[in-house]
Amino acid sequence: MSISNWITTAYLITSTSFQPLYGSFSDALGRRNCLFFANGAFTIGCLACGFSKNIYMLSFMRALTGIGGGGLITLSTIVNSDVIPSSKRGIFQAFQNLLLGFGAICGASFGGTIASSIGWRWCFLIQVPISVISSILMNYYVPNQKEYNRQNSSIFQNPGKILRDIDVMGSILIITGLTLQLLYLSLGCSTSKLSWTSPSVLLLLVGSVIILLLFILHERKTSARAIIPMELVNSSYSVVVLSISILVGFASYAYLFTLPLFFQIVLGDSTAKAGLRLTIPSLFTPVGSLITGFSMSKYNCLRLLLYIGISLMFLGNFLFLFIEKTSPNWLIGLFLIPANLGQGITFPTTLFTFIFMFSKSDQATATSTLYLFRSIGSVWGVAISAGVIQLSFAGLLRSNLKGLLDENKIKKLIVQLSANSSYIGSLHGEVKNTVIKSFDEATKRAHLMSTLLSSLALILCILKDNLAKPKTRR
């Protein structure tokens, strides 16, 4: 695996692996304290990334940033659930998603411009003052939950009880199991000689499965605050909702992964232009969240919203299959809107469908559990889409270039393109057109998979409505 890939992979591994810990840990240590830790780790990580001396240090600091980043979204959602009544929860989640969407749009749209104009370091350093300001605001406005304040005036008042509450063994098992799984996905879809079926890579998957099974057994017996209480996931209804969350996470992140590649390689966009092309459609993601929030508060129509959101995601993924190199820009932008709007509706509705099944005291761990399953889906979505594109692209090149180049030149070209997609710019004539056409078809194959999984999520919605909700303590 290219060392440069670890810049992204390191963050992905730690953010996903540590994310499920924040629910139970914040129950034991306090929301405010854990939020300060997460924001501090994220801030220090971004600062260190900006001053990294080499790519190894940059990758390591991205891992530190991921430890904090994995908790920021989870804890902000949990804090909202603590202080906001359920009747108004949708509106506040809508505004949270609006701000999150605005930040994502800014990052996607201007990241390439910042990197190409004043340098990549500023993509990290620009986040530091924003994170410092958020810490100051947290100090004044974010309290610990009432249950924590009644039991502990500080984390040092009763350290023995707190240590008994923290599920240390469960934390080690889930972090190790998820890390091995993410390493399997990352190495399997890399451009090296390794693949998902390589014995050394398969060992990572086997190890991940064994350790995660041990984690489940441990969670059933632990006397500490479970990372994922089994009562949250032991009903058919809960399993179906979490499965929907995995599928929409897979489809949405596979979609976001393939779009920039398609724009840059098939349409010939620069990095900055590819980001800007996503700006207007991306605005519909927070719009979808606002629609969800106000509809929930006024009509209490979670079930209908989930159908609408997933249907729009399916439509958006399906429409992408018809985008061509010759498609006008206005039509491309129009075809991108449904998937973004659907994601904005689906993400909060799956969250509330799950956490509203449980009592207020269980909603922190329920939130982190759902976010974990969604994150797993997103990681699998990106990794499998990358694998499908790579395998399809290589196969199509061998087939389509057979009459233009000899076998050795085709193999050499595949290696060069796998290592650096910008190598396409040095090609000419029929060879270049064939390479672009092959990549177009490869991305469409990956996107067809996302379309099918979106339809499967829709089928599970129908199945969910025929299942009884679990009876939980209130």
Curated annotation (Swiss-Prot):
This is Vacuolar basic amino acid transporter 2. Transporter required for vacuolar uptake of histidine, arginine and lysine and to a lesser extent tyrosine. InterPro entries: MFS (IPR011701), MFS_dom (IPR020846), MFS_trans_sf (IPR036259). Residues 55-62, 119-121, 189-196, 260-273, 325-331, 397-447 are vacuolar. Belongs to the major facilitator superfamily. Residues 1-33, 86-97, 143-167, 218-238, 295-303, 353-375, 469-474 are cytoplasmic. GO terms for cellular component: endoplasmic reticulum; fungal-type vacuole membrane. It holds the Pfam family MFS_1. It comes from Saccharomyces cerevisiae (strain ATCC 204508 / S288c). GO terms for molecular function: basic amino acid transmembrane transporter activity. The chain crosses the membrane at residues 34-54, 63-85, 98-118, 122-142, 168-188, 197-217, 239-259, 274-294, 304-324, 332-352, 376-396, 448-468. Glycans are attached at N420. One of its GO terms (biological process) is basic amino acid transport. Keywords: Amino-acid transport, Glycoprotein, Membrane, Transmembrane, Transmembrane helix, Transport, Vacuole. PROSITE patterns: MFS. It is found in: Vacuole membrane. Coiled coil: none annotated. Gene3D superfamilies: MFS general substrate transporter like domains (1.20.1250.20), Multidrug resistance protein D (1.20.1720.10). It is a multi-pass membrane protein.
